[in-house]
């Protein structure tokens, strides 16, 4: 599955194993950009890194699709779509090369993820989790129609416990003519 941008050389497609190393680099750089980790706190090395094995496992997973944005042969973004029970999918691992931010690439990746959730998994709803303390990030997703469910998920880590806000969005189903 490939999505072409209206202008430029940007292409969004399902990642394969040839993209693994570039994706690992992108995700690590996106997570650690500007001295901040994905948690909004100073990064610890392990938190700002993802292993090549983890990337390869995501690419090979049966019930998920790792999408990659490529511009002129360079990986500039990614998003993970995972099939969940009950006609739902989850959006995760949204990352954009720090030099390509504020150009609408995140919006394109979200749109591609939504289309993939519908076309590949038949989902009628998509959800994501945002760190509860990251209000700006929750506001970003709200601009795309995601709304808080009121549900929070807690993830215990070695040094802290992280609390996530669950947000969902209904997906438009194509109307048969």
Per-segment meaning from a language model:
Residues 1-21, 171-177:
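Conserved N-terminal entry element of GNAT/NAT acetyltransferase domains
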Residues 28-55:
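Conserved GNAT-fold acetyl-CoA-binding loop/helix
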Residues 52-68:
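A short helix-loop-beta-strand connector motif used in the catalytic cores of GNAT acetyltransferases and
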Residues 68, 74-82, 90-95:
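Conserved beta-strand in the GNAT
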Residues 69, 91, 102-110:
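Glycine-rich acyl-CoA binding loop
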Residues 83-94, 101, 120-124:
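A conserved beta-turn-beta hairpin within the catalytic core of GNAT-like acetyltransferases
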Residues 108-125:
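Conserved acyl-CoA
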Residues 123-139, 143-177:
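C-terminal "cap" of GNAT-fold acetyltransferases
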């Amino acid at each position: 599955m490939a999505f072409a941008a209206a202008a430029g050389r940007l292409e969004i497609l399902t990642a394969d194993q040839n993209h693994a190393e570039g994706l690992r680099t992108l995700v690590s750089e996106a997570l650690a950009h500007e001295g901040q980790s994905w948690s909004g706190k100073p990064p610890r090395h392990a938190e700002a890194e993802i292993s090549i094995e983890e990337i390869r496992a995501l690419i090979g997973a049966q019930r998920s699709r790792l999408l990659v944005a490529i511009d002129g042969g360079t990986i500039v973004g990614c998003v993970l779509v995972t099939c969940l029970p009950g006609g739902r999918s989850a959006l995760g691992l949204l990352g954009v090369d720090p030099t390509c931010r504020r150009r609408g690439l995140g919006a394109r990746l979200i749109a591609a993820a939504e289309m993939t959730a519908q076309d590949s998994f038949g989902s009628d709803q998509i959800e994501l989790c945002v760190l509860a303390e990251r209000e700006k990030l929750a506001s970003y997703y709200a601009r795309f129609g995601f709304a808080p469910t009121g549900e929070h998920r807690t993830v215990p880590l070695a040094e802290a416990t992280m609390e996530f806000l669950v947000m969902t969005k209904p997906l438009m189903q194509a109307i048969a003519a």
